[in-house]
């Protein structure tokens, strides 16, 4: 395999991290600006820094991708458009995007700028890659939940495929997580995830009993280990992946340096035909940051072995145990299993009280003060309060490794490009300077001054070399010099410096153009950012009820539901049969109501054929609508012309550009993101080309995950077949005593629901009057009797039979009146 087909892609949340990535051997770097990126808490880059970064990266033949991977509100489209123009004109190599509205807008105003589908787009199958290509994506970043075989299938579609190889994992499918949003108003889809998955939780039953009490389990039940693929990197390369992505825009530059350095060596060894990873690289990777390591879902579906349930952050490396304590308990003898150096940071996993840390500032070995100590030796160091005999000692910071890492981005770390110089000085002619880099690019400069005979000191090669060697502010260093000259000539130093500067600038231009030819600059556009507001069509809003059993369909119809949405992710753990779909359709038709079917939000490769067949069945049943929740199912469903397709909630519809995208895709309707406010909903209704739907009652899904906490901790999932009873009520309990229901769908995926039901009884009439075409009750977490009561209540409110009550006790109005950050 040629090297050009493999791209090592590094993160950069700061200038130092960018330099570290380039110097350590990255082929490409991804980073974010001050807005519209999914890591809003990183330092990120302003426009001046971005331009500087493009120059620096391209000079070293490193590609630069910019994250524009948040959901965007209509009020931000003007600023976004200006940003897109800037990114196009400054010469970045591509954008990583989530929002289909951003994709549509970028294609309209900066059509030459390559677009990559972010992992936030939840591409989970090869048909999802087809969808992304159809939407204009040159590359798809796959969901981290795919196996090697599934990645291979995605790679077969003719698009570039990017996959994560190292770093932090999300427990939820990226782009499908509302946990941070619903708990604290900080939306991961808007780049402000507060990482509540790294907090402690209890696993509770219906009686609020801790199911893990007394068991060998930690509290961080949603905190995965870090991904590390060095053991299986050849299999990923063989699968056909083009870009190998290291996670870590929030990480310090030392982390970037060490991880990129190790993966660079690993990839190069594969390309050389002798794959190996030195033990030193494995140790460095572990030391720089780890929550312990996993290959995630690449080799199999893991359970508890994927989780860092005892610690959600850097655990360091175990280097020994406390062998002795002095009587004051402030000095300890540590028996070392690994070397220790002055300046190292240590953490003691103490028996009582958790963990305490210190930095080694003085160390005795055999009674002598030492700078370092080897494995097997015993050293005496100062320790903090709380340390006891036999406590484990972890090194969380290795001073020598940090010094090594800082060589990649410190003041002396500049990675320079060798140039060969030819200087001519002929009497009666300008002096010329020709610089040639290691790839044959040439820069030329000459003096305004005409070379004269020397009156005093003649110019010699040493003098020329001294001036040509002054390349400190450039990206070059002088590799060789040829000085061709007449005898006894002179040229002022200032003139020579100017010719050198001209040659450097010309070489810059040649080198940059050879790597990334300039695209057409765009300074204005005619695209209308937001459609003209129109008066919403006057019609009665349809009450939609989402059911996952025929029993609930019957209850909802009897209570007055006008549209039944059947199927999708079924919280009763039962896969609806063909007979179930037929029964539901028959009941709905008999009642004279609208029938709709729903797909799950996650579809893996092996399930594509099943759903292709299911669409044929649905076509025969003639539903009024089919709700699509997975982008990979859109191309399959479009083949069935009789189906009226609706873009459902999981597709993250947040702005009018996205609504126009779905109209152009042939959608018959769209369901808005639950992260929108009432004001945003009203605005979108006024400009939408499609009928819109909003959720008004039920528990919002906070997470969907291939990981199952019940199966992992109670069902011995890691040992093979899961023994956990999915019908057993299960909850996550947090530090504030909130209880989040856990349900398992028909594909054994875990869904975590909000602790509070969404309820809009007090506002549903207003939503109907505002023109929301369909109002949804999610009945999947209710029993049939309770669902019937709720449907009847909303039917009466919308019909004016009862005065709209205040919201039901213990419920929430979600984001309708608070929004997200």
Segment roles from a protein language model:
Residues 2-123, 127, 141, 145, ...:
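Active-site pocket-lining/capping segments in soluble small-molecule metabolic enzymes
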């Amino acid at each position: 395999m040629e090297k050009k087909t493999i791209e090592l892609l590094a993160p950069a949340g700061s200038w130092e991290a960018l330099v570290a990535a380039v110097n350590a051997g990255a082929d490409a770097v991804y980073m974010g600006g001050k807005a519209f990126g999914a890591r809003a808490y990183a330092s990120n880059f302003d426009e001046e820094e971005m331009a500087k970064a493009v120059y620096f990266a391209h000079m070293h033949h490193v590609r630069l991708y910019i994250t524009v991977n948040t959901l965007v509100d209509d009020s931000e489209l003007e600023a976004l458009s200006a940003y897109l123009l800037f990114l196009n004109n400054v010469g970045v190599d591509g954008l990583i995007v989530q929002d289909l509205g951003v994709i549509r807008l970028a294609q309209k105003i900066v059509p030459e700028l390559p677009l990559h589908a972010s992992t936030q787009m939840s591409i989970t199958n090869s048909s999802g890659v087809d969808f992304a290509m159809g939407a204009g994506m040159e590359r798809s970043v796959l969901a981290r939940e795919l196996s090697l075989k599934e990645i291979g299938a995605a790679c077969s579609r003719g698009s570039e495929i990017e996959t994560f190889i190292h770093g932090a994992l999300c427990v939820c499918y990226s782009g499908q997580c509302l946990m941070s949003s619903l708990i604290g108003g900080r939306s991961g889809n808007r780049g402000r995830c507060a990482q509540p998955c790294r907090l402690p939780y209890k696993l509770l039953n219906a009686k609020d009993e801790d199911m893990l009490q007394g068991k060998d389990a930690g509290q961080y039940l949603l905190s995965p280990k870090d991904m590390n693929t060095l053991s299986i990197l050849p299999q990923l390369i063989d699968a056909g992946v083009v870009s190998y992505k290291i996670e870590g825009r929030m990480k310090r530059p030392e982390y970037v340096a060490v991880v990129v350095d190790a993966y660079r060596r690993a990839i190069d060894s594969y390309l050389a035909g002798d794959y190996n990873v030195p033990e030193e690289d494995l140790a460095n990777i572990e030391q720089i940051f780890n929550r312990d390591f996993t290959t995630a879902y690449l080799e199999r579906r893991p359970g508890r072995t994927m989780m860092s349930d005892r610690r959600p952050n850097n655990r360091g490396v175990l280097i020994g145990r406390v062998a002795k304590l002095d009587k004051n308990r402030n000095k300890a003898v540590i028996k070392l299993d690994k070397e220790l150096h002055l300046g190292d940071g240590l953490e003691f996993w103490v028996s009582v009280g958790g963990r305490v840390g210190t930095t080694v500032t003085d160390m005795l070995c055999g009674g002598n003060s030492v700078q370092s100590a080897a494995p097997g030796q015993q050293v005496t160091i100062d320790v903090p309060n709380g340390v006891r005999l036999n406590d484990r000692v972890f090194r969380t910071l290795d001073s020598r490794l940090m010094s090594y890492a800082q060589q990649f981005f410190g003041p002396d770390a500049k990675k320079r490009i060798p140039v060969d110089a030819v200087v001519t000085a002929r009497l009666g002619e300008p002096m010329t300077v020709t610089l040639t880099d290691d790839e044959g690019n040439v820069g030329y400069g000459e003096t305004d001054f005409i070379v004269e005979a020397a009156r005093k000191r003649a110019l010699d090669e040493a003098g020329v070399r001294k001036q040509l060697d002054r390349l400190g502010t450039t990206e070059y260093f002088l590799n060789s010099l040829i000085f061709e000259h007449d005898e006894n000539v002179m040229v002022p130093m200032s003139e020579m410096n100017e010719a050198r500067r001209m040659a450097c600038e010309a070489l810059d231009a040649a080198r940059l153009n050879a790597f990334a030819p300039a695209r057409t600059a765009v300074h204005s556009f005619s695209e209308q950012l937001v459609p003209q507001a129109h008066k919403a069509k006057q019609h009665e809003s349809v009450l939609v009820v989402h059911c996952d059993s025929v029993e609930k369909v019957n209850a909802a119809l009897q209570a007055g539901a006008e549209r039944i949405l059947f199927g999708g992710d079924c919280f009763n753990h039962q896969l609806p049969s063909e007979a179930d779909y037929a029964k539901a359709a028959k009941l709905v038709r008999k009642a004279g109501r609208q029938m709709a079917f729903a797909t799950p939000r996650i579809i893996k490769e092996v399930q594509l054929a099943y759903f292709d067949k299911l669409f044929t069945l649905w076509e025969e049943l003639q539903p009024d609508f089919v709700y699509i929740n997975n982008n990979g199912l859109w191309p399959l469903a479009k083949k069935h012309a009789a189906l009226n397709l609706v873009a459902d909630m999981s597709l993250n519809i947040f702005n009018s550009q996205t609504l126009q995208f779905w109209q152009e895709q042939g959608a018959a309707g769209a369901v808005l993101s639950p992260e929108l406010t009432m004001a945003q909903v009203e605005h979108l209704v006024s400009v939408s080309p499609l009928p819109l739907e909003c959720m008004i009652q039920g528990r919002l899904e906070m997470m969907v995950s291939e990981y199952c906490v019940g199966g992992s901790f109670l069902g011995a999932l890691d040992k093979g077949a899961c023994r956990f009873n999915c019908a057993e009520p299960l909850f996550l309990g947090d530090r504030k005593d909130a209880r989040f229901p856990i349900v398992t769908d028909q594909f054994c995926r875990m869904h975590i629901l909000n602790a509070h039901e969404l309820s809009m009884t007090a506002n549903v009439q207003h939503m109907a009057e505002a023109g929301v075409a369909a109002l949804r009750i999610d009945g999947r977490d209710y029993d049939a009797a309770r669902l019937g009561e709720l449907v009847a209540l909303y039917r009466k409110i919308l019909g004016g039979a009862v005065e709209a009550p205040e919201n039901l006790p213990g419920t929430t109005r979600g984001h309708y009146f608070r929004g997200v950050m």
